[in-house]
Design a protein with these regions (language model features):
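Extracytoplasmic/lumenal ectodomains and periplasmic regions of secretory and membrane proteins
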Residues: 162-221
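N-terminal "domain-start" segment that seeds a small globular fold
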Residues: 25-60, 86-90
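Structural microenvironment flanking redox-active thiols in thiol-disulfide oxidoreductases
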Residues: 85-149
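Juxtamembrane interface at the cytosolic side of transmembrane helices
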Residues: 247-267
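Short active-site neighborhood of thiol/selenol oxidoreductases, capturing the structured segment around
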Residues: 58-88, 105-106
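Extracytoplasmic
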Residues: 42-44, 64-67, 100-105, 136, ...
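Juxtamembrane/start-of-transmembrane alpha-helix segments at the extracytoplasmic/lumenal side
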Residues: 224-245
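Bacterial N-terminal signal peptides
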Residues: 6-16
Length: 267
């Protein structure tokens, strides 16, 4: 079921509405959410944030002359951000490259109300799952002011919207690969990431080069809504299809075993 949702929600997923009805964000709002691919665009290295240890750090200092994966989201995100980071960790675990030795990862919260304490909890969780030495000083979890977050998001081409009714954010899924100089080299979209493509992207960025513009498949995907207790139309169709396939495969497996058993008895 989780895989089916991840396959459908490739690029844009709206966080589930936990406290109110689903009419807080309109279709026009959703159309404005996404990425503007600004390949070659330098990010402002002087922008300052607070890290998970409550230290004020400049974005440029965290690059440390290495390629960097920039993940924009927020730590209290009830669904999408977890899927993005889950997919990222799965891809990273397939690489020979290591966080710290070969590249950095920077998670930045788009919620100005989130604190370094919240960031520290997420950092501990993800470093434990990544489980490779040397990542602690190179995988950063940052929080910032609304002004700083907005500037970074604008420069990165990251379009998101806050819903004051549900107190949540609608935002695109994916992450950005930066060169050691802080220029945008490539975008990755979705929640599942090809380790081979990621390896190539890191290698390309490490040489200061930029990749090409990637086609962004946009699916306005409704997901599980805790208010209605139902899945959205698109997801529901996929889940039904997966269920049918599962039943068919199970039936095929049973028939195959029965035939083998009959053959064995006949022999």
């Amino acid at each position: 079921m989780k895989l089916a949702i991840k396959l459908v929600c490739l690029t844009i997923v709206v966080s589930p509405l936990a406290q109110t009805s689903a009419r807080a964000l309109t279709a026009d709002d959703l159309k404005r959410i996404g990425y503007d691919q600004r390949i070659g665009q330098p990010l402002a290295r002087h922008l300052t944030f607070e890290d998970s240890d409550k230290r004020t750090v400049a974005l440029g200092d965290l690059l440390n002359h290495k390629p960097t994966l920039l993940v924009l989201g927020y730590y209290h995100c009830p669904m999408l951000c977890s899927l993005i980071n889950d997919g990222l960790i799965e891809a990273l675990q397939e690489l020979r490259f290591n966080v710290g030795r070969d590249f950095n990862v920077i998670n930045v919260s788009i919620d100005p109300h989130e604190t370094p304490a919240v960031a520290a909890v997420k950092k501990k969780e993800y470093l434990k799952r990544y489980a490779r030495p040397g990542a602690d000083g190179a995988w950063h979890f940052l929080t910032g002011t609304e002004q700083t977050i907005t500037q970074l998001a604008n420069e990165a081409g990251f379009r998101f919207k806050f819903d004051p009714v549900s107190n949540e954010y609608a935002h695109p899924s994916g992450f950005i690969v930066l060169t050691p100089e802080g220029k945008i080299s490539r975008y990755f979209f979705g929640v599942n990431f090809d380790p081979k493509e990621l390896r190539r992207a890191i290698a390309t960025a490490s040489n200061g080069r930029s990749g090409s513009v990637i086609h962004e498949l946009v699916l306005l995907c409704s997901h599980y809504n805790p208010i209605t207790g139902k899945y959205g139309v698109i997801v529901l169709k996929v889940l039904r299809a997966v269920s049918v396939m599962t039943v068919l495969l199970l039936a095929w497996w049973i028939v195959t075993l029965s035939r083998r058993h009959s053959t064995a008895e006949g022999g």
